């Protein structure tokens, strides 16, 4: 296959296809889903993510993105809130990914839906549900899905939790209380994020321990009730809430803290979660995916190689990933969450300080967008 093959139509893959096609490159993108689909994601768009999307020509307002100005932290005994220091946005991945893919197609990329990549072989051939091909340039942006032959080594990462996501219709009073906020609820063995998205739906996305899931017999309704009983604020929000999906989305084995280190002679390009996975409480996962796409396409368009790109990514994101992962490890110690929320109540400005340690730096974003 001549040109570039992008595997995966999420944020990183779609952004890469869009930028390369706009630069005149021949690009084919494979997306496993035949139609727009929901994905496990907190759907919090930080200012960094918004800057990358604006550079790609995406209009979040036109898509109905919801504004978020404040963060509210809750534990079993405490609640505290603070301004974010910027206006975040919230938009379903189904709407966001679809819009990016439409822009990529309009720029000249060939978008093929319903194609499932199965393996990358040693000779560079990619086997798929529609046959095999050997692309001139391969970009792997499969998100949380592993691809045989080019998997991630999760050793040393935080990959033991279970992830769930549900959309809910909250009671009017609870919806009003949540408007303009992202709520982070901290409980034993995990945490949950809750925020409004478009069409007056609420996104509940959370991580729990396998032990809790097993103790509750694998019952999702029972799990929500258990979490709501531990964190009263979450219980208030969930009271009377109506699920909007037939069943929740679920995932396991996500290697939080992963940062890809290239093997000698490695020629493929990894983007998004296939290159780096930052703990989701930072709200920077989508920003990091878009940042990786920007760096990789800059490398491709300027004649640099995968090793150069990965070095740039490690320079920009390695410290934040390490610090966020260390913070998540620390959060599992007894009493940490209560102390953290109490401290935030006394000093709301700590939110900005914490964000500075666990997110991409403004200089890194400016440098990437200038490339």
Report the location of each language-model feature.
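Predominantly flavin-linked oxidoreductase catalytic cores and closely associated redox partners
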Residues: 103-237
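Glycine-rich FAD pyrophosphate-binding loop
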Residues: 7, 18-41
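C-terminal helical "tail/cap" subdomain of flavin- and related membrane-associated enzymes
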Residues: 298-371
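Beta1/beta-strand and adjacent pyrophosphate-binding region of the FAD-binding site
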Residues: 1-12
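A conserved beta-strand/loop capping segment in the N-terminal third of enzymes
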Residues: 49-101
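FAD/FMN-dependent oxidoreductases across multiple families
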Residues: 212-299
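Residue-level detector of alpha-helix initiation sites
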Residues: 10-11, 35-36, 287
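Residues at the starts of beta-strands that form the adenosine-phosphate
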Residues: 3, 26, 267
């Amino acid at each position: 296959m001549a040109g570039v093959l992008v595997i995966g139509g999420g944020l990183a893959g779609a952004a890469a296809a869009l930028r390369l096609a706009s630069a005149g490159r021949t690009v084919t993108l494979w997306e496993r889903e035949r139609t727009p689909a929901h994905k496990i994601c907190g759907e919090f768009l930080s200012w960094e993510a918004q800057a990358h999307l604006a550079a790609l020509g995406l209009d979040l307002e036109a898509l109905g993105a919801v504004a978020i100005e404040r963060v509210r932290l809750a534990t079993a005994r405490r609640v505290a809130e603070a301004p974010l220091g910027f206006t975040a946005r919230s938009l379903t991945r189904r709407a966001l990914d679809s819009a990016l893919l439409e822009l990529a197609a309009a720029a000249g990329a060939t978008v093929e839906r319903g194609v499932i990549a199965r393996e990358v072989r040693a000779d560079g051939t990619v086997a798929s549900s529609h046959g095999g091909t050997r692309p001139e340039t391969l970009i792997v942006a499969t998100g949380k899905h592993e691809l045989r032959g080019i998997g991630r080594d999760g050793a040393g990462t935080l990959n033991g939790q279970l992830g769930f996501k549900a959309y809910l219709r909250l009671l009017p009073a609870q919806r009003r209380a949540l408007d303009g906020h992202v709520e982070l609820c901290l409980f034993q063995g995990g945490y949950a994020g809750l925020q409004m998205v478009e069409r007056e739906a609420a996104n509940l996305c959370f991580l729990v321990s396998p032990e809790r899931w097993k103790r509750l017999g694998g019952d999702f309704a029972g799990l929500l009730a258990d979490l709501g009983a531990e964190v009263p604020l979450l219980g208030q929000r969930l009271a009377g809430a109506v699920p909007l999906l037939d069943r929740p989305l679920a995932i396991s084995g996500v290697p939080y803290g992963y940062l890809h280190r290239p093997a000698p002679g490695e020629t493929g390009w990894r983007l998004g979660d296939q290159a780096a996975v930052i703990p989701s409480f930072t709200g920077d996962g989508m920003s990091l995916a878009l940042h990786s796409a920007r760096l990789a396409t800059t490398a491709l368009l300027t004649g640099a190689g995968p090793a150069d790109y990965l070095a740039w990514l490690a320079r920009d994101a390695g410290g934040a990933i390490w610090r966020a992962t260390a913070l998540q490890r620390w959060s599992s110690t007894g009493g940490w969450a209560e102390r953290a929320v109490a401290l935030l109540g006394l000093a709301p400005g700590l939110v900005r300080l914490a964000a500075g340690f666990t997110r991409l730096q403004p200089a890194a974003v400016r440098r990437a967008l200038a490339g």
